């Protein structure tokens, strides 16, 4: 089965730096609080220290983790653990990630440090032309071997997950702005195959740093930069007809959002909300946000409500954003002066900002983030030091909702039986595991 066939099956049912990329938005249901159940996951920091179990005599390399204590911080630092012959992704920025119930997928990225980028082994230096998978149940990184043409625009592209398919659009190669993309590439993660999505209509310009989301069966792309000109264009790709359309809102030019890149978007099915972003010399405020109304084909400006004690989140670009139902979470980013390490929540019904008590162990920008359907956010990579131009390969996770009893029991089971993934399906069924949980082990 080809990647394109896999896609069809799912279908039927001035420039700024590109060396970083906040992850795309995710959506998923999580259980709310219930008598305090599982609330300890939300207000304490836990260090993961279990080693993966291996049968036989294969050696395990275990990199010790720096112990971090942050008051009221529910962030978990995930250590590097991998088999001989397997390595975690090198430090990077400008990459993107998405998540499902089972894996975190990390694509692309940039690191100008020759040694950190893999040295002579990396033919695409300073970019990373690679797709990684982090398996939640075993805590193991794996670089995926794929067939087909993997795109070469590997910094500040857009990435979304649609069924079993990764959809990649735009991005830039090296030098930034000189080799941008405007194609949609599809990778079926089940069959590990890349394909170019054949589309009709006039495609968007070759850009990077844009934001992208799937809404009601269409792919929406907003903003970005050519490397010289910043954009406020809004395009729509109908995933059924595969036809591009540039939307022309019913607004005066003075009522349009400012041109920008490295912003994020959220949506409620009726409106697309633009969060932050900027240019190489500015970052836009979050006090007021622009929203595109899909029904009226017009931009609206919405005044958000500040935190009663702290006020509004700082203006930022190169941050990350994930979404759980009507709650949108932004973290990290850069405001033009300092790297940010805060996490904020915006409710799309009340437009009230709430600052989470958690603080990122490493303030970071040009990172990526994704949320699982259960409500756990994973944050990977990014730039952690402006003056030294230093990047990280750290991976963190934080529960944004109170975990369900199933998720709490699942994490306890994995911690108690680290060799669970080595058992056969028949053995796992005899142990009483459901098919859904068994799929998360494989």
Curated annotation (Swiss-Prot):
UniProt-annotated stretches for the region Interaction with CUL2: 401-442
Residues modified to Omega-N-methylarginine: 13
Pfam families, sorted: Kelch_4 (PF13418), Kelch_KLHDC2_KLHL20_DRC7 (PF24681)
GO molecular function, one term: ubiquitin-like ligase-substrate adaptor activity
One cellular component term from this protein's GO annotations in UniProt: Cul2-RING ubiquitin ligase complex
Pathway assigned in UniProt: Protein modification; protein ubiquitination
Region Disordered, annotated ranges: 1-58
Gene Ontology terms describing biological process: positive regulation of stress-activated MAPK cascade; protein ubiquitination; rescue of stalled ribosome; ubiquitin-dependent protein catabolic process via the C-end degron rule pathway
Subcellular localization: Nucleus; Cytoplasm
Main subcellular location: nucleus
Per-repeat ranges for Kelch: 87-154, 155-198, 199-260, 261-319, 320-364, 365-403
Stored InterPro entries: Kelch-typ_b-propeller, Kelch_1, KLHDC10
Function per UniProt: Substrate-recognition component of a Cul2-RING (CRL2) E3 ubiquitin-protein ligase complex of the DesCEND (destruction via C-end degrons) pathway, which recognizes a C-degron located at the extreme C-terminus of target proteins, leading to their ubiquitination and degradation. The C-degron recognized by the DesCEND pathway is usually a motif of less than ten residues and can be present in full-length proteins, truncated proteins or proteolytically cleaved forms.
Protein family (similarity comment): Belongs to the KLHDC10 family.
The protein's name in its UniProt record: Kelch domain-containing protein 10
Originating organism: Bos taurus (Bovine)
């Amino acid at each position: 089965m080809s990647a394109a066939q896999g896609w069809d099956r799912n279908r039927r049912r001035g420039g700024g730096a590109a060396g970083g990329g906040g992850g795309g938005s995710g959506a998923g249901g999580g259980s709310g609080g219930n008598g305090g159940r599982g609330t300890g996951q939300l207000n304490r920091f836990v260090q993961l220290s279990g080693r993966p179990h291996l049968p036989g005599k294969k050696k395990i390399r275990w990199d010790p983790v720096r112990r971090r204590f942050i008051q009221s911080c529910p962030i978990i630092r995930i250590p590097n653990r991998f088999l001989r012959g397997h390595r975690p992704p090198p430090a990077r920025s400008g990459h993107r990630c998405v998540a499902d119930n089972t894996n975190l997928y990390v694509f692309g990225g940039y690191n100008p440090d020759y040694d950190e980028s893999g040295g002579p082994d990396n033919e695409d230096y300073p970019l990373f032309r690679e797709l990684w998978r982090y398996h939640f149940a075993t805590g193991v990184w794996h670089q995926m071997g794929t067939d087909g043409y993997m795109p070469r625009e590997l910094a500040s592209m857009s990435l979304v997950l649609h069924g079993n398919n990764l959809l990649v659009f735009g991005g830039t190669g090296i030098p930034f702005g000189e080799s941008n993309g405007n194609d949609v590439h599809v990778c079926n993660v089940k069959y590990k195959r890349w394909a170019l999505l054949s589309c009709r209509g006039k495609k968007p310009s070759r850009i990077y740093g844009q934001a992208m989301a799937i809404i009601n069966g269409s792919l929406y792309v907003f903003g970005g930069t050519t490397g010289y000109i910043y954009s406020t264009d809004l395009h729509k790709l109908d995933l059924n007809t595969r036809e591009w359309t540039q939307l022309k809102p019913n607004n005066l030019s003075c009522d349009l959002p400012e041109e920008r890149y490295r912003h994020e978007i959220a949506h409620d099915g009726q409106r697309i909300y633009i969060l932050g972003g900027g240019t190489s010399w500015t970052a836009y405020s979050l006090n007021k946000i622009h929203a595109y109304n899909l029904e009226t084909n017009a931009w609206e400006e919405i005044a958000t409500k500040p935190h009663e004690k702290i006020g509004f989140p700082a203006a930022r670009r190169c941050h990350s954003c994930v979404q759980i139902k009507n709650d949108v979470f932004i973290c990290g980013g850069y405001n033009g002066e300092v790297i940010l390490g805060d996490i904020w929540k915006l409710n799309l019904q009340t437009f009230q900002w709430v600052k989470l008590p958690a603080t990122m162990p490493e303030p970071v920008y040009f990172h990526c983030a994704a949320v699982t359907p259960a409500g756990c956010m994973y944050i990977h990579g990014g730039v952690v030091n402006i003056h030294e131009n230093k990047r990280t390969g750290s991976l963190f996770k934080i529960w944004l909702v109170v975990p369900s009893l199933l998720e709490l029991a699942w994490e306890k089971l994995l911690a108690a039986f680290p060799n669970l993934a080595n058992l056969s399906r028949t053995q796992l069924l005899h142990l009483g595991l459901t098919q859904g949980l068994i799929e998360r082990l494989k």
